[in-house]
Regions:
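N-terminal segments that mediate ammonia production and transfer
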Residues: 1-215
Length: 215
C-alpha cells in the first residue's frame, strides 16, 4: 500500500450501506416503481449483514413518495378524511411495545404537536407480517404506527410546513429522551414529512417486502 500523502490517511477509508434509486422521469405514479425499488433492495443483500440467525438482519428499508390515495383510503377506515396531498404530513413512529410506555410517549408527542400549533388527525397501526423474522429481531421489534398531521391553514409554503415538522420531530425526541427512563425507551421517529415516508426495520433486504403488507 502506498504511504500516506498530504492529508490522506488509510484510516479515512470506510464502507457504506447500499443505496438504490428508482423514479419515473415522466412523473407517472405506479405501484410498480415500489416493487422495482424493493427488487433493487433485494439485489443488494451483500451490502447488509446477519449474524448466526440468517433471518435477523442489521437493518433495511425503503423511502417512498407519500402514497396519498392509499393513505386516504386507510384513514377513511379510521373515520378520518385526509386533506389534499401537501396539506398533511405522514410520519412513521416506533413506539415501545409496553402499553404504559407507549401511551406516555404518545401523550408527549400529542402535547408537543399542540404546543407547535399542529393538529394530529389520527394514528394508524402499521400492519406487519413477522412470520419470517428471527428471534433477535423480534425481541427488539417496536410497535409501529403512522401519524397524520394537518398543515395549519396559515402555512402556505410547503417548506415552512416541513421545517415545522422537523422541529416537532426533534423537540418530541428530546422531551421523551429526557423524561422517560432511558433503559425503557423504544421511541424513534423514522420519518415525518409531507413528501415522503420510510418503511424500515431490523430486517434483511429480502424481508422488507413481506414484512410490510402496505408495500
Amino acid at each position: 500500500m502506498a504511504g500516506n500523502q498530504g492529508l490522506y490517511h488509510p484510516s479515512f477509508e470506510h464502507d457504506a450501506c447500499g443505496i438504490g434509486f428508482v423514479a419515473n422521469i415522466k412523473g407517472h405514479k405506479s405501484h410498480q416503481h415500489i416493487s422495482d425499488a424493493l427488487t433493487v433492495l433485494e439485489n443488494m443483500e451483500h451490502r447488509g449483514a446477519c449474524g448466526c440467525e440468517q433471518n435477523t438482519g442489521d437493518g433495511a428499508g425503503i423511502m417512498i413518495q407519500t402514497p396519498h390515495e392509499f393513505f386516504f383510503d386507510e384513514c377513511l377506515k379510521l373515520g378520518v378524511h385526509l386533506p389534499s396531498f401537501g396539506r398533511y404530513a405522514a410520519g412513521m413512529v416506533f413506539f415501545p411495545k409496553e402499553i404504559r410506555l407507549r401511551e406516555e410517549c404518545r401523550d408527549i408527542f400529542n402535547r408537543s404537536a399542540e404546543k407547535l400549533g399542529l393538529e394530529i388527525l389520527c394514528f394508524r397501526k402499521v400492519p406487519v407480517n413477522t412470520s419470517g423474522i428471527g428471534p433477535t429481531a423480534l425481541s427488539v421489534e417496536p410497535e409501529m404506527e403512522q401519524v397524520f398531521i394537518a398543515c395549519p391553514d396559515h402555512i402556505n409554503n410547503p417548506d415552512d410546513f416541513e421545517r415545522k415538522l422537523f422541529i416537532l420531530r426533534n423537540y418530541t425526541t428530546h422531551l421523551i429522551n429526557s423524561t422517560v427512563r432511558k433503559d425503557e425507551i423504544g421511541f424513534y421517529i423514522a420519518s415525518l414529512s409531507y413528501k415522503t415516508i420510510v418503511y424500515k426495520g431490523q430486517l434483511t433486504s429480502h424481508q422488507v417486502r413481506e414484512y410490510f403488507p402496505d408495500l
